[in-house]
Swiss-Prot record:
Biased composition (Acidic residues): 38-48, 65-82, 101-110
Protein name per the record: Male-enhanced antigen 1
GO biological process: cell differentiation; spermatogenesis
Gene name of this polypeptide: Mea1
Residue list for modification Phosphoserine: 103
InterPro entries hit by this protein: MEA1
Source organism per UniProt: Mus musculus
Role noted for this protein: May play an important role in spermatogenesis and/or testis development.
Region entry Disordered, spans: 1-83, 95-123
Highest taxon above the source species: Eukaryota
A GO CC term assigned to this protein in UniProt: cytoplasm
Record's keyword terms, sorted: Developmental protein, Differentiation, Phosphoprotein, Spermatogenesis
Tissues expressed in: Highly expressed in testis. Transcripts can be found in primary and secondary spermatocytes, and spermatids, but the protein itself is only detected in spermatids. No expression in Leydig cells, spermatogonia, or sperm. Very weak expression in the heart, kidney, spleen, thymus and ovary.
Length: 174
C-alpha cells in the first residue's frame, strides 16, 4: 500500500485506525460529541446497564452438558416409550386423529388414492359443504386458459381418467 504524504504526515492504515498507545495530535483525534466511537470508553458499558440500545441484553447460553435440565428418554423403551411420546404430543396440543382403519374390501383405485394423498376424514355433511363452497368459487377470466374454456366438464373428466389409468399402468419411477 502506498503512503500518501500530506503536510509531512504519512497516511496509511495505521493512521486511519490508530492503536491505543499512539498519541493522537489535536487535529487527528476525535472531537467531543462527534460520534459513538471513543478509544477511551470500554464497550462493557452496555453490559453494566444490562440492556443494549433497544432494551435487549445478551444472555450467554449454558455450555456445560452436565447441567442440562432436559431429560432424554432412553432408547428402546418399546410400547411404554411410544405411549409416553403420545402423552407428550397430546399435552402440547399437537395430537392428530388416528388414521382411518383400512378395510380389505377397498378397491385398488381407492387404496392408491389414499396412499398417495394425505386423507382428511369427512362426514357427508362436510363433503356437501365443500361442494357448495367450491361451486360458488369463480375464477377471473384471465385466470382460466383458453383450452379450459373450450372443453366440457365431461370431456375433461375423460382426459383425467385416461391419464390416471395410464399412470397406474406404467411402472413407478422410484
Amino acid at each position: 500500500m502506498a503512503a500518501v504524504v500530506l503536510g509531512g504526515d504519512t497516511m496509511g492504515p495505521e493512521r486511519i485506525f490508530p492503536n491505543q498507545t499512539e498519541d493522537l495530535g489535536p487535529h487527528q483525534g476525535p472531537t467531543e460529541g462527534t460520534g459513538d466511537w471513543s478509544s477511551e470508553e470500554p464497550e462493557e458499558e452496555q453490559e453494566e446497564t444490562g440492556a443494549g440500545p433497544a432494551g435487549y441484553s445478551y444472555q450467554p447460553l449454558n455450555q456445560d452438558p452436565e447441567q442440562e435440565e432436559v431429560e432424554l428418554a432412553p432408547v428402546g423403551e418399546g410400547e411404554d416409550g411410544a405411549a409416553d411420546i403420545q402423552d407428550r404430543i397430546q399435552a402440547l396440543g399437537l395430537h392428530l386423529p388416528d388414521p382411518p382403519l383400512e378395510s380389505e374390501d377397498e378397491d385398488e383405485e381407492g387404496a392408491a388414492a389414499l396412499s398417495s394423498h394425505s386423507s382428511i376424514p369427512m362426514d357427508p355433511e362436510h363433503v356437501e359443504l365443500v361442494k357448495r363452497t367450491m361451486a360458488g368459487v369463480s375464477l377471473p377470466a384471465p385466470g382460466v386458459p383458453a383450452w379450459a374454456r373450450e372443453i366440457s366438464d365431461a370431456q375433461w373428466e375423460d382426459v383425467v381418467q385416461k391419464a390416471l389409468q395410464a399412470r397406474q399402468a406404467s411402472p413407478a419411477w422410484k
